[in-house]
Amino acid sequence: MKDKTIWQEVLNRGKWVIILLVAFVLSQFPIGLALFLANKQFPILQSGLLVGALSIVVLIVFIIGARKTQLATFNLSFFKAKDLARLVLSYLVIFATNLLGSLLLRLTNEVTTSNQSILNGLVQNSSLISTFFLLVLIAPICEEILCRGIIPKKIFRGKEKLGFIVGAIVFALLHMPTNLPSVIIYGGMSTVLTWTAYKTERLEMSILLHMILNGIAFCLLALLVLISRNLGLSF
């Protein structure tokens, strides 16, 4: 009987590993489409609408899946003033680690991280509509559900603390750190996001924080893109 229970537990965790991998692949469809359309020099407006439409489909699947499996309710009725203070403080900590990482990049004669360089190239050659969906919606919702939802709560169920650590490492690795500065930037970001989800026991809180981070980054990138396209400058 005990062996049967252990076998069932292994099968259940294995099922969630497969779900994690399938969900990750699904989350990459919008950016894959954006890269494909940019490579084919598809009209910017139409490509933005296509990527936006696909992103909405992916988001619906993720949100429904998270609600059905009780990873998140996406009901913000719990949100209070102290939660706003937590988000502000968390953002400032991430900003500080990003600043430290950026200073170290300068000292090593590098301008930006490998991940940011790829992102800049995508933004320059894609619609701002695509960038908005990918940065502000797809990345925060999908990455948080994967790294701070499925990994700690399902795959490591019963050992959530270990699961949060693994999820934090996976998140950092997904952003392709190639040197110490990029490890500080993405490792710091991942640590704060993980702490937020763990401490509040609300995946919605880390999603909100992630959205704020990427939303501010999107606004800055959009401004640079508009300057670049109107004045013929590059960044």
Regions found by a protein language model. Give the residues of each.
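Membrane-water interface at transmembrane helix exits
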Residues: 31-39, 63-71, 101-106, 142-143, ...
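Alpha-helical transmembrane spans of integral membrane proteins, capturing the lipid-embedded, hydrophobic core
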Residues: 13, 17-29, 52-56, 87-95, ...
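Juxtamembrane helix-loop-helix connectors linking adjacent transmembrane helices
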Residues: 39-45, 71-139, 226-235
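Alpha-helical membrane-inserting segments
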Residues: 26-38, 61-62, 93, 97-108, ...
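Transmembrane helix-loop-helix hairpins at the membrane interface
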Residues: 3, 96, 125-235
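Alpha-helical transmembrane segments in multi-pass membrane proteins
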Residues: 13-69
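Cytoplasmic juxtamembrane interface segments
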Residues: 59-79, 204-205
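Short, Lys/Arg-rich, polar N-terminal cytosolic tail immediately upstream
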Residues: 1-10
